[in-house]
Amino acid sequence: MDAFNYRGGELFAEGVALSAIAERFGTPTYVYSRAHIEAQYRTFADALEGMPHLVCFAVKANSNLGVLNVLARLGAGFDIVSGGELERVLAAGGSADKIVFSGVGKTREDMRRALEVGVHCFNIESTDELGSRLQIVAAELGVRAPISLRVNPDVDAGTHPYISTGLKENKFGIAIADAEDVYVRAAQLPNLEVLGVDCHIGSQLTTLEPFIDALDRLLALVDRLGDCGIYLRHIDLGGGVGVRYRDEEPPLVADYIKAVRERLDGRDLALMFEPGRYIVANAGVLLTQVEYLKHTEHKDFAIVDAAMNDLIRPALYQAWMDVTAVRPRDTAARSYDIVGPICETGDFLAKGRELALEEGDLLAVHSAGAYGFVMSSNYNTRGRCAEVLVDGDQAFEVRRRETVAELFAGESLLPE
């Protein structure tokens, strides 16, 4: 579904005009659609109906409590990578026993807290996490820690190198060539309980082949482990299903799940997925206002009140984000670079966009629901945006805008 549509010459989020949101909450503001989030989650859940499964939303994509609560109400699980994300999920009403704890840098304190609340399992990223960390922490608490090994299948996801995570040179996971030995070691540790196998080969994948290649390699490993007397209960295929930003043609989730289920036919394995971008990317826009237009001999600039500190994907990944006027004009369009107030040449949201603009116009940067606010910063001492969640014809502020005073409230001067 597309939650952002024009009505009477104006862009709406579900049943709320974006201009009304700007008037009420100001700009820049992230705007999310509850209906879109729910529809995307159900695409996964419905395709898995009839078999044991858990769809764990990747909290790193969008960690707003309002967004997490929408998913918790649907019965979603959650994929986390820090103690902070654990506390967010719990505060949002998520069930601890539906949380998988991933990440290469889990601290002992993180592990202890996760064991105390009873997470579903830890996705182990290295051998050092086993004996020298998790085994010791679990023994101190007198419990068995449920684990899954994150196996690196050495599959090229064919995506941006910063978000490709399944190659042998990446920092993530345990090399598939070493995995069997690590499983044998884990099975011998008294305070660990081996549950499954996990992999995540990258983000924003637009073909099925890398997923299926990785799955086939994991299933071969599952068979070898069975020969050793180690029987796994689940297989976690991570996230990575791409979305449409411009002209991509990502695979349908139904086709992906169908191919996976065919390969698992006859196997007693539950299926787990960790989608993030797929669920929230196109559920959100960044709403921004044109401060003024700057025309030079070589370029035309639309200087807006949002900047790279609010949305860093274009600067960091050279990501293409669609930009449209909230109230399109009938006048002649010009090619504009959409730039912010940050003191960096790399501070841009889009380049070379054909738009008819005037000072004060509102723009919507689309597909901003994933890796938007969560990657924002206070660079140039700029307060972070407000976040608004739209539910039908109502808009709710689920995060208020930061004030300048809050930015240095935790700082202090040296004594005289």
Swiss-Prot record:
Please give one Pfam family short name.
Orn_Arg_deC_N
Summarize where substrate binds, as residue positions.
Answer: R277, R313, Y317, E344, Y371
* InterPro entries found in the cross-reference section: Ala_racemase/Decarboxylase_C, DAP_deCOOHase_LysA, De-COase2_C, De-COase2_CS, De-COase2_N, De-COase2_pyr-phos_BS, Orn/DAP/Arg_de-COase, PLP-binding_barrel
Please provide, alphabetically and separated by semicolons, the GO molecular function terms listed in this UniProt record.
diaminopimelate decarboxylase activity; pyridoxal phosphate binding
Question: Pathway of this protein?
Answer: Amino-acid biosynthesis; L-lysine biosynthesis via DAP pathway; L-lysine from DL-2,6-diaminopimelate: step 1/1
Q: Which residues carry this modification: N6-(pyridoxal phosphate)lysine?
A: K60
Stretches assigned to coiled coil: none
Name the coenzymes or cofactors required: pyridoxal 5'-phosphate
Entry EC no(s): 4.1.1.20
Q: Return the broad EC class.
A: lyase
Q: Which domain of life is it from?
A: Bacteria
Binding residue positions for pyridoxal 5'-phosphate:
G240, E274, P275, G276, R277, Y371
The UniProt subunit note reads as follows: Homodimer.
Q: Hey, which family's this protein in?
A: Belongs to the Orn/Lys/Arg decarboxylase class-II family. LysA subfamily.
Q: Quote the function comment for this protein.
A: Specifically catalyzes the decarboxylation of meso-diaminopimelate (meso-DAP) to L-lysine.
Q: Fetch the NCBIfam families from UniProt.
A: lysA
Q: What is this protein called?
A: Diaminopimelate decarboxylase
Organism for this UniProt entry? Pseudomonas fluorescens
